[in-house]
UniProtKB/Swiss-Prot annotation:
The gene is VDAC2. This is Non-selective voltage-gated ion channel VDAC2. One of its GO terms (molecular function) is phosphatidylcholine binding. It comes from Sus scrofa (Pig). Monomer, homodimer and higher order oligomers; formation of higher order structures is necessary for scramblase activity. Interacts with ARMC12 in a TBC1D21-dependent manner. Interacts with KLC3. Interacts with SPATA33. Interacts with PPP3CC in a SPATA33-dependent manner. It is found in: Mitochondrion outer membrane; Membrane.
Length: 294
């Protein structure tokens, strides 16, 4: 995402991947909130360059505790990244990625997962290619019934973005996903619209009002229904170490969050979700998250 007060050169810089279209608006709605969870994230790096990331959370409604552990090592000389993953469902994952070695802008990733409890295995080959004005992606999910192919393309010029995303299920010999998106992006404004499978329509607007205030509007509608989903969110930077976030939707769900950097590498987030239609009935949710990084 471009920074405030800057615009992309013409022709524009590398466009985002399809999954990242509209990301600036989504981040205002999602980051700084953690309703119904008590969460701890820890990140550290060894002297040899190995990165360790661990995360644990407890659901305040169900009491269920989940956790993940990830180690990552980058061999920069050869553009290689090795990643090992584990979670409390006892699923093991291995990922090997190589970037900018075969050709500039090309990244290849081989991703596997294995569950010792069930014996289930999965494999995926991911590829992405990004250059000025274009961002392409192709992933292949391997399955015993037949591989599924995911493809995407985003083209950009002078701030305008156009993207297409599809999934072809070889077992069924048909397209199972067919999505389009159009958007416009400048340094402090982003507009994104999308159509998913011809039935789901959505749009979002991101606006950096000033250096300390970011706002976002989100709209979604599904054909065949009278239900339109609408939301407004904002984030205000109180000072370099603290920020407050708020959002509300047409279901009268009101969310607020407060993030404070206690010291370098230590961040605390408090959040609350209030049902505006039944304030006295209860059912509201609180959240607490602590991030440690060294």
């Amino acid at each position: 995402m471009a920074s405030y007060g800057q615009t992309c050169p013409r022709p524009m810089c590398i466009p985002p991947s399809y999954a990242d279209l509209g990301k600036a608006a989504r981040d205002i709605f999602n980051k700084g909130f953690g309703f119904g969870l008590v969460k701890l994230d820890v990140k550290t790096k060894s002297c040899s360059g190995v990165e360790f990331s661990t995360s644990g959370s407890s659901n305040t409604d169900t009491g269920k505790v989940t956790g993940t552990l990830e180690t990552k090592y980058k061999w920069c000389e050869y553009g290689l990244t090795f990643t090992e993953k584990w979670n409390t469902d006892n699923t093991l994952g291995t990922e090997i990625a190589i970037e900018d070695q075969i050709c500039q802008g090309l990244k290849l990733t081989f991703d596997t997962t294995f569950s010792p409890n069930t014996g289930k295995k999965s494999g995926k080959i991911k590829s992405s290619y990004k250059r000025e004005c274009v961002n392409l992606g192709c992933d292949v999910d391997f399955d015993f019934a037949g591989p599924a192919i995911h493809g995407s393309a985003v083209f950009g010029y002078e701030g305008w973005l156009a993207g297409y995303q599809m999934t072809f299920d070889s077992a069924k010999s048909k397209l199972t996903r067919n999505n389009f998106a159009v958007g416009y992006r400048t340094g402090d404004f982003q507009l994104h619209t999308n159509v998913n499978d011809g039935t789901e329509f959505g749009g979002s607007i991101y606006q950096k009002v000033c250096e300390d205030l970011d706002t976002s509007v989100n709209l979604a509608w599904t054909s065949g229904t009278n239900c339109t989903r609408f939301g407004i969110a904002a984030k205000y930077q109180l000072d370099p170490t603290a920020s407050i976030s708020a959002k509300v939707n047409n279901s009268s769900l009101i969310g607020v969050g407060y993030t404070q950097t206690l010291r370098p590498g230590v961040k605390l987030t408090l959040s609350a979700l209030v049902d505006g239609k039944s304030i006295n009935a209860g059912g509201h949710k609180l959240g607490l998250a602590l991030e440690l990084e060294a």
